Amino acid sequence: LQRSKTAREAIKVMTTIANTYGYNSEGETFTICDPNEAWIMEMMGKGPGSKGVVWVALRIPDNAVCAHANQSRIGKFNMKDKKNVMYAKDVVSFARSKGWYQGKDADFSWKMAYAKPDFSGRRFCDARAWALLNHFYDMSPYLDWALGKDPNAKDMPLWVVPNKKVSVADVVACMRDHYEGTPLSVADGTDIGGGIWQM
């Protein structure tokens, strides 16, 4: 990142280095910011026998709050929006070559092709993103997704426009959240098999 002056440059540097030297990871999500822009990028190594990565990066709107927690969050994205979206040239074709996606480019969802959320991903990871976003936006329509039980539940938005100005104290409160006061709370001693997961 020291080689970059902007978030856009950092994305190009990171993906160029990973494509040149390889990247041994099942997938990572990065928040990359500069004084003017914030981006969320997801990147995955191509696996044994292949060097390089597939990746996608989306610019988070200036008026929005975004959250991610150990689970792929980027779904569908507008491949024509060059101002706010960057991606590997083979982001769709690589998924097709592996048999992970067969549809049209316009319907492609990164996370459904490369890291489809299962119960654990939703209940223990997306739930933490849900809790953070719930501080700034009514996330109740997406509770079933965060609970992880219904495979057809309404997916969460990647970001939300907050219902108030976000302060440093608000962010601190988010990081201390344990789902108190929500159906995700385990404060009553409910054993969900994983204990209390903190952000």
Where are these regions (language model features)?
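C-terminus-biased signal that marks the final domain/tail of proteins
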Residues: E9-T15, G22, E26-E28, D34-A38, ...
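Short acidic, glycine/serine/threonine-rich loops at helix termini
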Residues: E42-G45
